[in-house]
């Protein structure tokens, strides 16, 4: 009979397994752990609860969280509060789709493969690039993989990255680069954008590529046309990290001549979820097609002439040639990519443009409201849905007081750069109403 309620193994099973591996007891398996640090007391667990009692307790705990269903959120910095069409959860909950894994058997996975193909197609169209892959883990790892591709393609070992790129993405790149012995140099930002003079001085024949964010971490729209000319004159690659929603209004990076465009599709159908899991995307020009990391789904025809979808160019991947793979990305974000596909398809081209326009209009209204009320708003150039406001108190204190008023405040820029202490990065999406924006500005009146 089994010793444990939830483990079907009997004492005889246990004895036979221990005999096979040559140990006498379960304790022998942990002999490498010093005796003095082993946990030997009984677990101080509370008595078991019934399911309804447990649900009540967990609901009570969950209610302590500040959530965007009950609070007006002005927090962005890479993760945003956007409307998720109700059909998204319905579709991704279907058993045929409910997996984060890539389908290796096309004969029984046509639905999922087509959904991934649609994701690739929509991302390629939004970014203005020739093709996109099936997804990456998130925007930060997509950016790092783009830099690795640039280094491998150009056979150069140095990457330049704008200081106006999200600092967390920049840190992910530095982590990747360490293992590959690639040097990363940060080009400072000035007035919320890349310092062009510093970039010109840093360019040399050992530069594989330059990474820029569009719109950038401070919400500003970088001059991609000018950057493209500079970078390509140096025979380096232009790598652009972009918010895909902004591309409903902004000129796509591909039209400026970007070589690689990456980002995170969290803005389409994926909840904030305390920072993840989300869904990175990776789009390139045709010349880089065979060096793309991750899965690629292609359209073909079977022996009867019927349309079909398959994983293509698989020789690039680690499950085929691990030591020579373009990347070691494995199980990807297929389920979240599906969520983004459903959200984009539901919005359609007109709806996506309208959603982007609402972000633009509402954020510009908020910025104007701050200025009218005497706040110092940094940077005067164009932006999409984020801007920077200077306050008189530490942002952490301000945000704690805002929670009492049902408001989730903006991002504390001083967290990564002391130059921006007491500066708040404010994000305004289509979810915010005029009344909420007005209340937010009024709540900050005492700290301007």
From Swiss-Prot:
Catalytic activity: N(6)-[(R)-lipoyl]-L-lysyl-[glycine-cleavage complex H protein] + glycine + H(+) = N(6)-[(R)-S(8)-aminomethyldihydrolipoyl]-L-lysyl-[glycine-cleavage complex H protein] + CO2
Enzyme Commission code: 1.4.4.2
GO biological process terms, semicolon-separated: glycine decarboxylation via glycine cleavage system; nucleoside metabolic process
Alphabetically ordered keywords of this record: Oxidoreductase
UniProt entry tagged with the keyword Acyltransferase: no
Single GO MF annotation: glycine dehydrogenase (decarboxylating) activity
Disulfide bonds, paired cysteine numbers: none
Top class in the EC scheme: oxidoreductase
Keyword Translocase: no
InterPro entries: GcvPA, GDC-P_N, GDC_P, PyrdxlP-dep_Trfase, PyrdxlP-dep_Trfase_major, PyrdxlP-dep_Trfase_small
Function noted in UniProt: The glycine cleavage system catalyzes the degradation of glycine. The P protein binds the alpha-amino group of glycine through its pyridoxal phosphate cofactor; CO(2) is released and the remaining methylamine moiety is then transferred to the lipoamide cofactor of the H protein.
Family: Belongs to the GcvP family. N-terminal subunit subfamily.
Binding partners and assembly: The glycine cleavage system is composed of four proteins: P, T, L and H. In this organism, the P 'protein' is a heterodimer of two subunits.
Name of the protein: Probable glycine dehydrogenase (decarboxylating) subunit 1
Taxonomic lineage from the root: Bacteria, Bacillati, Bacillota, Bacilli, Bacillales
């Amino acid at each position: 009979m089994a010793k444990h309620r939830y483990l079907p193994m009997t004492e005889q099973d246990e004895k036979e397994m221990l005999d096979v591996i040559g140990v006498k007891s379960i304790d022998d398996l942990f002999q490498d752990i010093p005796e003095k640090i082993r946990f030997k007391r009984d677990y101080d667990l509370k008595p078991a609860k019934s399911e309804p009692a447990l649900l009540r307790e967990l609901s009570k705990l969950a209610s302590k969280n500040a959530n965007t269903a009950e609070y007006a959120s002005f927090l962005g910095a890479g993760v945003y509060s956007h409307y998720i069409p109700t059909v998204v959860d319905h579709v991704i909950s279907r058993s045929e789709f409910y997996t984060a894994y890539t389908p290796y058997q096309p004969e029984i996975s046509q639905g999922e493969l087509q959904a991934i193909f649609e994701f690739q197609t929509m991302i390629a169209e939004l970014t203005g690039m020739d093709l996109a892959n099936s997804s990456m883990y998130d925007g930060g790892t997509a950016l790092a993989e783009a830099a690795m591709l640039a280094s491998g393609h150009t056979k150069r070992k140095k990457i330049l990255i704008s200081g106006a790129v999200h600092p967390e993405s920049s840190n992910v790149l530095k982590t990747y680069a360490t293992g590959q012995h690639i040097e990363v140099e940060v080009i400072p930002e000035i007035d919320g954008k890349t310092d062009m003079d510093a970039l010109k001085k840093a360019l040399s024949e050992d530069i594989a590529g330059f990474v820029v964010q569009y719109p950038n971490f401070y919400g500003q729209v970088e001059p991609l046309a000018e950057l493209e000319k500079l970078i390509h004159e140096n025979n380096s690659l232009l790598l652009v990290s972009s918010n895909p929603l902004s591309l409903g209004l902004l000129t796509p990076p591909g039209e400026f001549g970007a070589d690689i465009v990456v980002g995170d599709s969290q803005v389409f159908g994926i909840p904030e979820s305390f920072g993840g899991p989300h869904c990175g995307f990776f789009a390139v020009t045709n010349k880089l097609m065979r060096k793309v990391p991750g899965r690629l789904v292609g359209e073909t025809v079977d022996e009867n002439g019927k349309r079909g979808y398959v994983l293509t160019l698989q020789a690039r991947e680690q499950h085929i040639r691990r030591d020579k793979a373009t990347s070691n990305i494995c199980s990807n974000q297929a389920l979240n990519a599906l969520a983004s596909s459903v959200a984009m398809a539901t919005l359609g081209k007109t709806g996506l443009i309208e959603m982007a326009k609402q972000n633009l209009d509402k954020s510009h209204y908020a910025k104007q409201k701050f200025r009218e009320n005497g706040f110092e708003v940094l940077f005067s150039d164009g932006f999409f849905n984020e801007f920077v406001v200077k306050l008189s108190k530490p942002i952490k204190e301000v945000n704690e007081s805002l929670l009492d008023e049902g408001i989730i405040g903006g991002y504390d820029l001083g967290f990564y750069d002391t130059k921006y202490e007491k500066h708040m990065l404010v994000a305004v999406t289509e979810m915010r109403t005029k009344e909420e924006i007005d209340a937010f500005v009024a709540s900050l009146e005492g700290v301007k």
